[in-house]
Amino acid sequence: MTVAVDIGNTNIVVAVLNNGEWNKPFRVFTDTKKTGDEYYVIFSSLFDERGVERDKVDKVIISSVVPFLTRSIEKNMRRIFKKDPIMISHSVECGLNKATIPPELGADLLCNMAYGHYHHKDGAVMVIDFGTALTFSTVSKEGDVLGVAIAPGLVTAVNALFGSTAQLPQVELKVPSSVLGRDSMESIRAGIMEGYSGLVEKIIANTEKELGERLYVMATGGLSSTISTLIDRLDELDPILTLKGLGLFADLN
C-alpha cells in the first residue's frame, strides 16, 4: 500500500493506494498553528479509524506547497509508518523533461503535469486545478513543461469580495439559474461562475493559439465538478488527479 499526502494551502488531503484503487481518503484543515504532536494525534486516529494497517504500508509520498508544515508532516508520517517518505521535488523521477521544469514550480503542479503527460501521451496536455489558486499547467507531447498560468481561485475571489463589502451574504458556489441575478446571492454566483468559466475558456483558447495545436484539457480540484458544466472545452474531469500524480511518483521512485 502507498499513503499519499497532499499538503495544500486550504486542506491536507490524504489517501491510500491499494491494488490500483484509491480508498480511505480524508481531509484535514491546513493550520500552521498546530504543533507536530497535534498533527500526530489527528493523523494516527484517522488512519486507525479507517482501518489502515500500518505494517502493510510500503511507501509514503508527500507533496507540499506549505513549507512551514512540510517537515512536521514528514516527521509524523515517518513516526506513524516507520518509512522515510518520498518528498516531491524537481530531483525525483517524474516522467517529464527535468531540464524544462522551472525552479519555482510547485509540487502540486508538478504532480498534475506528470500525471497529465502519463495519462495522455498523444499530444500536449493542460491540467486545470480549481483550488485555492486556479492554475493552468501545460506540458508538451514530449514531456516538456511549457508553462503555467495562475489566477485567484473561485473561493479566494469570493472571500476577497466578502472582505471588502460588508453587506454581501455568504454564498454557496453553484451554477446560477441565470446570468442576470435578481438578488445578492444569485448575482455573485452569476459573476463568479459565469465569469470564471469565461476566464478558463479564454486561457485555453489563447494557449492553443500560442502553441498552434489543440490541447487535451483535464480539470481537477474541489470546484471542478461544479463549474465543469459551464465549460465546453474540458476533455476530462478527474477530482483526484493530483493524488494520481502522487501515485505515479511513488511508482517511479
Place the predicted regions along the sequence by residue.
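Short beta-strand-loop/turn "lid" adjacent to the catalytic site in phosphate-handling enzymes
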Residues: 52-105, 142-147, 153-154, 183-193, ...
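Active-site nucleophile and cofactor-binding loops and adjacent substrate-binding regions
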Residues: 102-109, 237-241
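Long hydrophobic alpha-helical segments typical of transmembrane helices together
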Residues: 210-253
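Glycine-rich phosphate-binding loop plus the immediately following alpha-helix
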Residues: 31-35, 105-112, 117-122, 146-189, ...
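N-terminal glycine/serine-rich phosphate-binding loop of ATP-dependent small-molecule kinases
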Residues: 1-91
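Gly/Thr-rich phosphate-binding beta-strand-loop-beta motif of the actin/hexokinase/Hsp70
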Residues: 1-25, 116, 122-145, 161, ...
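Phosphate/pyrophosphate-binding loops at sites that engage ATP/ADP/AMP, CoA/4′-phosphopantetheine
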Residues: 43-59, 203-215, 253
